């Protein structure tokens, strides 16, 4: 083992103020108080907060930190921070380095400058950040980062972390009720475990700088299909190029220093596409870590003259990027509640948790679809590269057979675990999993967890996990209400499983989600099919969903309606930015470039005619390009008029529909016209790098 490899355990988490560092630097009383705060939510006395703050500051300054920031996750989907130095005047024009318990525990931010959905007006600017002691502070770029929640002056949530923490707490409470019914008195907490698989593209910075659409929108707004894409399937799991490997190595080291469990990396399907997957951890930490991962992907790429694209669909014609959210439940004693065991038909506890998940997904499929809706994800979902827009659950043959036997009241004989015959004697036998890998399913059971595959690559994982946690808490609470009152627990459990699986079996689909027939089958089953963000957003204000989140105190009705408004406004603004960017590129570069080329073609035709030479090829091309350029000009004019006539982005559903049906429709038409022009215009005239230039630049 070489020296750098030996050092990994030593420097892992070296920039994190974790439990070990607290144990070393805090008094026994302060450490115990922090532990009680972590496990039981006990408030920290001011004196203890002061001691923790002082220890945290001393540790951070030893690492070179000069500032601290309350790091929070507003409704923008990315993190926010305001940096304050540790300096405090001490008289005689001198300073000391200090961080008080008050500064650690609470900060202030201008809430009116972040998306609030009407919860904050410009003249109601005050918002507060409050320390989340369940997330470790860390040092990055000579700044102490303190994870916090963000709320308004009146206490309404303005971030993504607060609802997540609330949902984790509610789920914990309901899981313990179920475990007690099965005689488990050892577990004191149940924590959702999450492992997000992060996909991304890496392109050369010089190519990025020459495309306004990439710089302003994060994706290309046009691009003719390159001669080679992903047809040969040669990029997926292919050898990692040296330049990318060096980037990945540095990224791993940066993440490991911050305590992020970066584990697996490989090439993805599309050219220039890659994936990074971490080891599972609790949902709150996983959410923080994924935000750090996305930030460091961009930062480290920049050091290597690369650009990391996190957009869901940066290039048409090749696979887009998603983020598979692997979700499970674990007790503080180490038991995975979604692990079937060797005989799932007899594992009643597992079946009850499975029933709760199936029931919850069926009843709240609209809000699950809604929580992954985003303009970028609209370009990916429903194509033959990502799950369809219809929510369904894949269980695999064995579990489906178990459910069928419960529904029909027949005995079930467990399948003997088969062996996959490899056919090569030198290889060991590999046990065949009881579930295949159905890549077309939005929610797939993969042995001991559910894989939610609809998330977009740029999306925070906070909202989807908040929804999963709340749905599960609600269903488990209903089950506990029934079983706690049962005279005969075993009989009541059997009836509950039978009734639940029978009532909600429509949500289970083990087939090919890419097949066109699935949409019709889903309609026949009564499943919802919201094709885009605009159609799915009303789920936020559906009385059923408002009732779900308010009865568990995850959101208030006002907070739900605010998020509905924020997402619709965001849709309008993103669509407007893309349309304006494309309009600028067409008017300033594409139309003039094609005009120059056609002018030169026209002169070539005249010269050939003067020499009585055949110029039919040039004439045909000239006519084709002239027609396309004229149509592009007309479409651009219509797009400009549509933008001028557009309603205010704060206009709710009506405004979002206008941007989708009018503005985006014209953008889509213009994009395809540009693609045709690119494919037929001489390379020396074309003003932008092509897909072939960009995708194969690294």
Where are these regions (language model features)?
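Glycine-rich, acidic/polar active-site loops that bind/position phosphate-bearing ligands
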Residues: 124-310, 319-322, 329-565
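Active-site-proximal loop/turn and secondary-structure-junction residues that shape catalytic pockets
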Residues: 48-52, 72-74, 102-103, 150, ...
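Short linear, low-complexity motifs centered on an aromatic residue
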Residues: 77-93, 112, 211, 218-220, ...
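Histidine-centered active-site/metal-ligand motif
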Residues: 47, 67-70, 266-268, 324-326
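Flexible inter-domain linker/hinge segments
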Residues: 1, 6-20, 169, 173, ...
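Hydrophobic/aromatic-rich, well-ordered segments within soluble, folded domains that form packed cores
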Residues: 65, 69-73, 289-303, 329, ...
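C-terminal amphipathic alpha-helical interaction region
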Residues: 497-698
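Histidine/acidic residue-rich metal-binding segments in metalloenzymes
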Residues: 4-7, 11-101, 106-121
């Amino acid at each position: 083992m070489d020296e750098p490899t030996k050092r990994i355990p030593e420097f892992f988490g070296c920039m994190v103020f974790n439990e070990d560092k607290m144990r070393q630097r805090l008094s026994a009383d302060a450490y115990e108080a922090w532990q009680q705060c972590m496990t039981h939510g006990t408030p920290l006395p001011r004196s203890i907060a002061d001691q923790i703050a002082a220890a945290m500051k001393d540790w951070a300054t030893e690492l070179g930190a000069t500032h601290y920031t309350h790091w929070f996750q507003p409704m923008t989907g990315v993190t926010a921070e305001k940096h304050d130095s540790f300096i405090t005047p001490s008289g005689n024009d001198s300073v000391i380095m200090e961080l008080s318990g008050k500064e650690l525990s609470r900060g202030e931010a201008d809430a009116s400058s972040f998306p609030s959905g009407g919860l904050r007006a410009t003249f109601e600017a005050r918002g507060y950040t409050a320390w989340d002691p369940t997330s470790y502070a860390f040092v990055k770029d000579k700044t102490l980062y303190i994870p916090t929640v963000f709320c308004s002056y009146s206490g309404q949530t303005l971030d993504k972390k607060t609802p997540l923490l609330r949902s984790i707490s509610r789920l914990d409470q309901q899981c313990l009720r179920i475990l007690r019914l099965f005689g488990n008195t050892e577990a004191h907490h149940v924590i959702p475990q999450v492992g997000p698989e992060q996909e991304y593209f890496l392109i050369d910075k010089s190519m990025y700088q020459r495309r306004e659409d990439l710089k302003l929108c994060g994706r290309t707004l046009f691009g003719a299909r390159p001669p080679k894409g992903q047809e040969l399937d040669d990029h997926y799991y292919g050898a990692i190029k040296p330049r990318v490997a060096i980037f990945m190595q540095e990224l791993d080291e940066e993440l490991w220093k911050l305590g992020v469990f970066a584990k697996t990396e490989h090439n993805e399907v599309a050219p220039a596409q890659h994936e990074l997957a971490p080891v599972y951890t609790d949902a709150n930490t996983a959410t923080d870590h994924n935000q750090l991962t996305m930030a460091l992907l961009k930062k480290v790429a920049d050091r290597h003259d690369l650009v990391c694209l996190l957009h869901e669909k940066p290039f048409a014609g090749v696979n887009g990027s998603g983020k598979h959210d692997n979700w499970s439940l674990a007790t503080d004693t180490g038991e995975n509640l979604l692990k079937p065991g060797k005989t799932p038909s007899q594992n009643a506890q597992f079946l009850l948790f499975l029933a709760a998940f199936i029931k919850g997904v069926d009843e709240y499929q609209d809000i699950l679809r809604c929580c992954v809706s985003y303009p970028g994800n609209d370009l990916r979902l429903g194509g033959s590269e990502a799950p369809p827009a219809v929510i369904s659950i894949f269980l695999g043959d064995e579990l489906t057979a178990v459910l069928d036997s419960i529904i029909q009241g027949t005995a079930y004989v467990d399948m003997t675990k088969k062996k996959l015959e490899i056919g090569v004697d030198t290889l060991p036998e590999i046990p065949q999993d009881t579930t295949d890998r159905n890549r077309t399913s939005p929610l797939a059971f993969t042995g001991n967890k559910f894989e939610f595959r609809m998330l977009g690559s740029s999306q925070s994982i906070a909202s989807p996990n908040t929804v999963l946690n709340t749905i599960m808490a609600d269903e488990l609470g209903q089950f506990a209400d029934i079983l706690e009152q049962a005279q005969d627990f075993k009989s009541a459990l059997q009836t509950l499983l039978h009734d639940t699986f029978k009532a909600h079996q429509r949500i289970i689909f083990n087939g090919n989600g890419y097949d066109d027939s699935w949409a019709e089958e889903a309609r026949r089953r009564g499943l919802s099919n919201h094709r885009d963000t605009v159609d799915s957003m009303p789920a936020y204000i559906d009385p059923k969903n408002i009732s779900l989140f308010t009865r568990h105190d995850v959101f208030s009705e006002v907070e739900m309606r605010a998020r509905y408004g924020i997402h619709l406004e965001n849709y309008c603004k993103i669509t407007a930015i893309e349309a304006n960017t494309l309009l600028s590129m067409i008017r300033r570069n594409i139309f003039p470039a094609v005009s120059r080329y056609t002018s030169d073609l026209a002169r070539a035709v005249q010269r050939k005619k003067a020499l009585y030479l055949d110029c039919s090829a040039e004439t045909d091309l000239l006519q084709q390009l002239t027609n396309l350029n004229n149509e592009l000009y007309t479409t651009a004019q219509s797009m400009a008029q549509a933008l001028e006539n557009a309603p205010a982005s704060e206009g709710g559903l009506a405004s979002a529909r206008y941007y989708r049906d009018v503005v985006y429709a014209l953008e889509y038409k213009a994009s395809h016209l540009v693609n045709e022009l690119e494919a037929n215009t001489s390379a020396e005239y074309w003003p932008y790098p092509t897909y072939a230039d960009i995708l194969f630049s690294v």
